[in-house]
Amino acid sequence: EDGKEIMHPGYVAKEPPKSYWNLAGAMYAYIYTETAKMGIDVLGESQLVGFPSQFPSVSMMDYNTTEPNARFWILKLLKDNFGLGDKLVETTNPSSSLAAQAFETRHGKILLVINKRNREQQITLPEETDGASVSLVAPSTGDHAPAEQTLHGHPLSRQPFEVAVVQYE
């Protein structure tokens, strides 16, 4: 998506690297946490399907396969777990490479963890999260639905640009 396709008919731009979709989704999740802190209730994300002539870098679907990409799955993860009336809980971020925000939601206590870097990061979570369920979108999940895990032990490794939702008591 370098603009050349407009000026040069038949030109095909290079596909973005696979990690791009995780980066774009992680950025959106980070923006969600920051706007929630400002009291903003509604965000939008563009666009569902973007063909090469229509800015495919903002698409939530792979136009070749019609399958959702990481941007879609992260948006769905946020939509399914957070909403109006959620309360932000004071949260200490362990490092500038990670973003963490706790919420009290209609589903219970949820911690949103975002790896803002293109490398693995370690995070130690509070003991009360031991045994918690985690839904995550990361490079290892590819263009598939979020992976589900149960937390056991600390610290945890978070993949590059991973977005994880930790649901605990």
Which residues fall in each region the model found?
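Active-site proximal loops enriched in glycine and acidic residues that flank catalytic Cys/His/Asp
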Residues: G44-L48, V113-N115, L125-E127, A138, ...
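Solvent-exposed beta-hairpin/edge-strand motifs
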Residues: E128-D143
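Aromatic/acidic polysaccharide-binding cleft in carbohydrate-active enzymes
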Residues: E1-K76, D80, L88-L98
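Hydrophobic, well-ordered secondary-structure elements that form the walls
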Residues: T35, L75, L111, V134, ...
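Acidic surface patches and DE-rich sequence motifs
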Residues: T105, A138-P139, T150
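Glycine-centered loop/turn motifs
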Residues: G83-V89, G131, F161
